From Swiss-Prot:
GO terms for cellular component: plasma membrane. Transport of potassium into the cell. Likely operates as a K(+):H(+) symporter. It is found in: Cell inner membrane. This is Probable potassium transport system protein Kup. Belongs to the HAK/KUP transporter (TC 2.A.72) family. It comes from Pseudomonas syringae pv. syringae (strain B728a). The keyword RNA-binding does not apply. It catalyses: K(+)(in) + H(+)(in) = K(+)(out) + H(+)(out). Keywords: Cell inner membrane, Cell membrane, Ion transport, Membrane, Potassium, Potassium transport, Symport, Transmembrane, Transmembrane helix, Transport. It holds the Pfam family K_trans. It is a multi-pass membrane protein.
């Protein structure tokens, strides 16, 4: 996801065709590689669907209308309009829905729950996508060479481990190839589809939705269940929204309707035509659709496409983690910028290694793309359902759509998403438990961190010395003042920071200027420089400064303070000292959280990145003071 920020920076100057190609390379990798396994999974996934004329046309009709309804209608017409100052993605949407429901605390809490659970499922998706995509590409080798079955997993692992190992170096150089490679991929998909359709043109009858309805009538027992496989054609739909901030709605929409949708539909119908003519080809209709001479080049192109799709979700996980950190739901981590030109190209080591471990376990544990498909559907449909719920709140409470218009539409959207999710629920017991368990663990971690930070602030505030009383005491008994500016980071605006009290106790001095600095993260992605800071003078050389950042802004505190042009405040590097407080949490029987959650929070706090690195403070101008807090 963050791969594209370089394009966003030059968005105004980029030609439409260049931006469209770039969008294809980043946004559509996941959904673009779905033809590798979707139709095969429908008939080979243990659903009990016979490979008959009516079943093939019925399944194709379901795929066709799913792409039209979910992607072309829901995402393109509605979800992409729910941008948070141009940014998309479930964390940005959650911030928007939280703002929309600000007057309704219970509803706001529900929006946070849906947003966090959708985000947690996205992390599961970020593990499943690389595993299932690369495995499905490698499985083409079974058709090209005999006896390679047992080499598929090792080769997939080599590719995937290599992909994660290069993340710290960035992908800016090879990233310029993503667009052209994926455009080539979609052109090949379309060409293969046309080739297949020419063999059995009657497959085009599946455009008629009656074939989809007929499928449910013929297969009453498995009609809904089969949607659990059909939804694989929609994997990656969430990326359309998540990457909107990098390219904008129009390039993403144009790429979908001009290139991606036609190529996908042609390929699915081409595979269907192939299976109509020869039911045995259902074992791998994607690769068997290609002429024999084209098989190896197609495997190579498929591998490149799946690597690009994997890179997109890995970068997306990095970007979403940054948003979650700044919104206060994940502990601070070391964030490395991998490009001096593109601000959004970042690397987060902890996330990278966690994803790599998850991917390796998935590949070794499931061994094939078909086995992984069960896990895939649960993550995809869960995230889609959470997105629809959040968008519904935005439509009704922020956009103020008339209920008579909005409610019937939203019911239809939620009904379809609910059917897809319900179809995947039974898969939880057939391999789909992984994304649910991973999502549950991540949800617990995020909510524990958020609640723990709230409780920590409350405990620190208890018995805090009010600032007016402290300043009044200084007027009565002035301490020795030294030259320079002391900046104390604090979450409260009305109490004296512990670091300031400790400094007074041990050093018996105050600086000429004392700044109580609070950093506030807004529910919007960016805050303009003109609105970055607020300044209030308390007298006696004391000032309150509040810095405002968006959830994708880089919180560079020294750079932000340099914009504060007040003659009485001097933030020059050699005259400014930063005082930080480092809390150590001691779990106790006090009210707040369960003891195990307090212990978990204490562990996360101990291992979180401190303010020094996160706020880009100069190492040689920082004094850190520790304090113990019972929770």
């Amino acid at each position: 996801m963050s791969q594209a920020n370089s394009h966003a920076e030059a968005g105004g100057a980029a030609k439409p065709i260049g931006l469209l190609i770039a969008a294809v390379g980043v946004v559509y990798g996941d959904i673009g590689t779905s033809p590798l396994y979707t139709l095969k999974e429908v008939f080979q996934g243990g659903y009990g669907v016979d490979v008959t004329h009516d079943a093939i046309l019925g399944v194709l009709s379901l795929i066709f209308w799913s792409l039209i309804w979910v992607v072309s209608f829901k995402y393109m017409a509605f979800v992409l309009r729910a941008d948070n100052q141009g940014e998309g993605g479930i964390m940005a949407l959650m911030a928007l829905a939280r703002r929309a429901s600000a007057k309704h605390p219970r509803l706001q809490m529900m929006m946070v729950v849906f947003g966090l659970f959708g985000a947690a499922l996205f992390y599961g998706d970020s593990m499943i996508t690389p595993a299932v995509s690369v495995l499905s590409a490698m499985e083409g080798l079974e058709l090209a060479f005999d006896g390679l079955d047992h080499w598929i997993v090792p080769m997939a692992l080599i590719v995937l481990v290599g992909l994660f190992l290069i993340q710290r170096h960035g992908t800016a150089r090879i990233g310029v190839l993503f667009g052209p490679v994926m455009v080539t991929w979609f052109l090949v998909l379309g060409a293969l589809g046309v080739y297949g359709i020419m063999q059995s043109p009657e497959v085009l009858k599946a455009v008629n939705p009656a074939w989809g309805v007929n499928f449910f009538i013929i297969h009453p027992g498995i009609g809904v269940a089969i949607l659990g496989a059909v939804v694989l054609a929609l994997t990656g739909a969430e990326a359309l929204y998540a990457d909107m901030g990098h390219f904008g709605r129009k390039p993403i929409s144009r790429a979908w309707f001009i290139l991606v949708l036609p190529a996908l539909l042609l390929n699915y119908f081409g595979q269907g035509a192939l299976v109509l003519g020869n039911p045995e080809t259902v074992r791998n209709p994607f690769y068997l659709l290609a002429p024999g001479w084209a098989l190896l080049p197609l495997i190579g192109l498929s591998t490149m496409a799946t690597i690009i799709a994997s890179q997109a979700v890995i970068s997306g996980a990095f970007s979403m983690t940054l948003q979650a950190i700044q919104l206060g739901y994940i502990p601070r981590m070391h964030i490395q910028h991998t490009s001096s030109d593109a601000q959004g190209q970042i690397y987060i080591g902890a996330v990278n290694w966690a994803l790599m471990a998850g991917v390796i376990l998935l590949v070794i544990g499931f061994e094939s793309s078909g086995a992984l498909a069960s896990a895939y559907g649960v993550a995809v449909t869960g995230t889609m359902l959470c997105t629809t719920i959040l968008v519904s709140t935005v439509m009704l409470m922020l956009w103020k759509w008339p209920p008579l218009l909005a409610v019937p539409l939203l019911i239809c959207l939620l009904l379809v998403d609910g059917l897809f999710f319900a179809a995947n629920v039974p898969k939880i017991f057939q391999g789909g438990a992984f994304p649910v368990l991973a999502g549950a663990v991540l949800f617990i971690l995020m909510t524990t961190w958020k609640r723990g930070k709230q409780l920590l602030a409350e405990r620190i505030d208890e018995g805090g010395l009010p600032l007016p009383i402290f300043i009044g005491s200084i007027r009565v008994q002035p301490p020795h003042r030294v030259q320079g500016t002391a900046v104390f980071l604090t979450a409260r605006s009305d109490a004296v920071p512990h670091a300031l009290l400790h400094n007074m106790l041990h050093n018996q001095v105050l600086h000429e200027q004392v700044v109580l600095l609070t950093v506030v993260y807004e529910d919007s992605p960016r805050v303009p420089s003109a609105q970055r800071f607020e300044v209030e003078s308390y007298g006696e050389g004391f000032y309150r400064v509040i810095l405002h950042f968006g959830f994708i802004d880089e919180p560079d505190v020294p750079a932000a303070l340099a914009l504060c042009h007040l003659p009485e405040l001097d933030f020059s590097p050699m005259r400014t000292t930063y005082f930080l407080s480092r809390e150590t949490v001691i779990p106790s029987k006090m009210d707040g959280m369960a003891r195990w959650r307090e212990a978990l929070f204490a562990f996360m706090l101990k291992n979180a990145n401190g303010n020094l690195r996160f706020f880009k403070l100069p190492f040689n101008r920082v004094i850190e003071l520790g304090t113990q807090v019972e929770m």
